[in-house]
């Protein structure tokens, strides 16, 4: 669960850092915990159509991070994912599109003057190392009997704990979507571990605290729409694209 939080946050922070290649972003995400390689895995439909917004607050030493809250709009259909962080005042906008079927990704940028540019690159996957997964395997997850209603969905309380920290997640089990599977499209040889999440459903609220109490991350899901999506979020129309799919994948 913590890996899910950290990867999600890292993807959000990476999309804000304009000018980095996908490989550089992936390397920064993993912090040396995995290898970046081209995605040659068989295509598998995502199995979910919809959208939502993540609201993420990070704390250190009990103090809210200056960049919080961070908002990330996410959209899905069988063949695509789109990530769109909320633009800050006087800054350009960015959107990332993951074409799961054709194995290419797009980073689209709109500057302060409205100029639209983008980069097309090969899809990347991360091959995790054994040390990282040893920690994941040791995570203790408990499905409790406690429930509450969030945005008209009955959510069940889960608790989780490992040597790095502990947390509480409220999961809408009626929503047939596994975020581990969606994020797993970016994970390499051991992506099956993402599929072994001890639940099926949408994480509506999640709070993780480090073992020493110095860090805390709170995430909530808002504006959940199921069964339909704005296809424009997967479109590159109107952007001047630079095709970099012929470049070699560095950092393997």
Residue spans of the language-model regions?
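Extended soluble regions of mature proteins
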Residues: 21-252
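Bacterial Sec-dependent N-terminal signal peptides
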Residues: 1-22
């Amino acid at each position: 669960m913590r890996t899910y939080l950290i990867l999600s946050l890292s993807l959000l922070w990476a999309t804000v850092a304009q000018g980095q290649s996908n490989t550089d972003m992936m390397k920064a995400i993993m912090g040396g915990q995995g290898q970046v390689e081209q995605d040659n895995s068989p295509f598998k439909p995502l199995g979910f159509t919809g959208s939502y917004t993540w609201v993420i607050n990070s704390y250190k030493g009990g103090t809210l991070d200056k960049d919080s809250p961070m908002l990330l709009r996410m959209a899905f259909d069988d063949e695509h994912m789109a990530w769109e962080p909320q633009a800050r005042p006087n800054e350009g906008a960015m959107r990332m599109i993951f074409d799961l079927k054709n194995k290419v990704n797009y980073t689209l940028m709109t500057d302060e003057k409205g100029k639209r540019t983008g980069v097309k690159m090969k899809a990347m996957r991360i091959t995790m190392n054994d040390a990282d997964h040893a920690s994941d395997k040791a995570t203790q997850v408990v499905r409790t009997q406690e429930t509450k209603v969030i945005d008209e969905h009955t959510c069940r309380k889960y608790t989780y704990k490992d040597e790095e920290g502990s947390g509480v997640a409220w999961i809408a089990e009626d929503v047939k979507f596994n975020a581990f599977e969606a994020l797993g499209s970016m994970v390499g040889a051991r992506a099956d571990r993402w599929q072994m999440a001890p639940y099926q459903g949408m994480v509506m609220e999640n709070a993780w605290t480090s073992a020493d109490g110095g860090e805390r991350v709170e995430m909530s899901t808002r504006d959940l729409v199921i069964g339909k999506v704005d296809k424009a979020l997967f479109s590159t129309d109107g952007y001047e694209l630079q095709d970099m799919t012929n470049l070699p994948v560095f950092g393997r």
